[in-house]
Amino acid sequence: MDLFQSPGGDLIQDEDSVEVIEMLCIDFRDRLLVALSTTCQSDFREAKKVVEERLRDILETASSLSSTEVTSSPNASPLYNTDAPEDVVPTVGLDVGLDEPMADYSQNTPSITGGTASAEYQNSGDTNQMTLEDPACVDMFAAESQNTGHIPDSCLRDWSFEGVSMKSPSLFDWSSRNSNFPLTQEHENQFAEFLTLFEGEPNFDNWLSTMTWSSLESHSSPINGHSAGATPQLDQMHTVSNSRVARSVVSESTVTNTGSANSLNSGLLANTPSSSHSSVFERACSSVQEPTPEPTPVRGLQRKLRKQGPRQTTEATPCDQQIGPRASRATSQLPERRSMKMVRKEARDTPLTTSPANSTQINIEANTIPSDLSVEYAFGCFSDAKEVFETFYKRLSDDRKHLSSLLMRLFYAVGSPDALRQLRDALDLSRKNSMIASYHDSNDLAATVSVLDQLDATTTLSHILRRYHLVRLLDHRSKLESNHKAAKLAVKGTKRRLKYDCERIELMRRGENADCDANTRSAKERLKYRSKTRALTDLMQTLYPDLSPDSEGITTAGGCEYTRKLTKLRNRLACARNWYQFEETFPGAILALIPCATGDLSISIDHVEKLPSDVLKIFLDYLKERRGVFLSKMSRILSKDLYDVLMRRNVTKRYKLEQTNENSLTDGLHDDDRLLELCETV
């Protein structure tokens, strides 16, 4: 490699060197800015501005040199002459623009000292020449030799680069530590594995304050670097197409965080492994991936590395609060420790996955079962409550699955000891002279509690009697509907013939205008009365003979009253529908064996009465399948005289459950034969 120096301006006599210098300066600028971006210093913006200004001066100086000035520089003399003695070295007068010279890095690093250039580089030929165009770049190259401008032989005689041409394909980049130190494919792999010797990012505190690279002594032991989570965005960095920054050299065991990954891919760590790490460095070379043939952008690489599982970071700390150096650990344990951190990070980020068989069950428990005491009571008392719930959940449609918990509670509430306890209180109240609690002038605590107990019994008794009477009301309506259906079927043939004859007579009378008149008749004139509607009308006429509906367009007081009564009658018939289904499925006294809202399972009358018909059918089918035999026996035993006792028509009959202690009923087992014995009369 032939280098020349002019006595006046230290110009270079190769036009291609201008492009080389520009590439090196831009590469140095980008590497330096990326190094700044990996730190979390508060004065990052100020340091960035200073570096940009100094680098801009270098670029302007390099770009201002034209080919004419380069070739016409007089008295060009060699900057480096192999015949010159080693102690005579010309100095460079132009300073680089950085305030401090670059410090020495290590003993193993080729430094710019005295010596002669190796023959391989001197005789590389005209096509492989690499010359410098400006003393500023010479000064940057020779910073370690205190701006002597002397190109050392040790820098170019390294054993790893013997026989390598300057424009060889294997020589694809410059080292980030020393721009005069070539970096081959083999060294790129070794440099990536070398970064694994450091835990976290390097500490750039002293470097930012002096704008120089830190020396080897400051990195003798790993320093707890800053968090990579607060990396500033390099939106103002200028991208150059011919720049080879961010060479992708990714290793599975080394890519652990964003900060170290940026340093790895950009080659920014200005330290050489010491001799104590050389064995580890050589052993780890075999596990490093080959470098990517094309450069990867810094931002795209950062996003890629974050997807691979970056290490969790913390907020950046000020310079005066940073953690000091800590003792270095065994380097062989670093890949294992980092892999464990990545595993923990992936475990925190990865959502729990379950098999398809268990996913439905989890959704049922999380979204369907309400966290109320009645459900907890059912799951705590009954071992098969889970099975019952899942059965209802599977049989119900998607829009009715939220009723599974209610059906599960109702399944155990029918004919339960709690239902018998409430029935005992209702029977006791029905045998008294007055169902209304007696009035007390004094505000006595015992009397107040006694009245409340009596009112609860009154509520239970009223609920049971209401069920009976609702079923009777619906039964009346059903009988009227059946009568209308039978009458309609009886006169169907005669009515059809009569209708046909009347229509023919009407057509003959009206002639041509008959079809037009038939089409203009309103729908109300041709209103068809269904059997249910006519049965409801008959009920209203029987119950309220003095009321009649209003005519069209006329509103009267009697008509409004009729409408209110009709609405109330329809609501009662709707409430009686489900109780009627219970009575048909378990004939007898099943209506008295369903507890009220005061029970442990919290079954209110609204819960049962507002269940859809299809849902109630599913419930009754499963209830009859599982507990049908027991409930049918209990309903038949109580049905003989229960209604008469509740209505106080015959209070002489007594049941065994009335003579049983309340605790005995509460502690009773479900579907136990002893409960059937309590339903018998004395």
Swiss-Prot record:
Residues 63-73 have a biased composition (Low complexity). Residues 63-86, 107-129, 251-358 are annotated as: Disordered. Signal peptide: none annotated. Residues 335-349 have a biased composition (Basic and acidic residues). Pneumocandin B0 is the starting molecule for the first semisynthetic echinocandin antifungal drug, caspofungin acetate. Pneumocandin B0 is a minor fermentation product, and its industrial production was achieved by a combination of extensive mutation and medium optimization. Inactivation of three of gloP/GLP450-1, gloO/GLP450-2, and gloM/GLOXY1 generates 13 different pneumocandin analogs that lack one, two, three, or four hydroxyl groups on 4R,5R-dihydroxy-ornithine and 3S,4S-dihydroxy-homotyrosine of the parent hexapeptide. Residues 257-279, 310-320 have a biased composition (Polar residues). Transmembrane segments: none annotated. Part of the gene cluster that mediates the biosynthesis of pneumocandins, lipohexapeptides of the echinocandin family that prevent fungal cell wall formation by non-competitive inhibition of beta-1,3-glucan synthase. The 10,12-dimethylmyristoyl side chain is synthesized by the reducing polyketide synthase gloL/GLPKS4. The thioesterase gloN/GLHYD exclusively interacts with gloL/GLPKS4 to maintain turnover of the polyketide side chain. This is Pneumocandin biosynthesis cluster protein B.
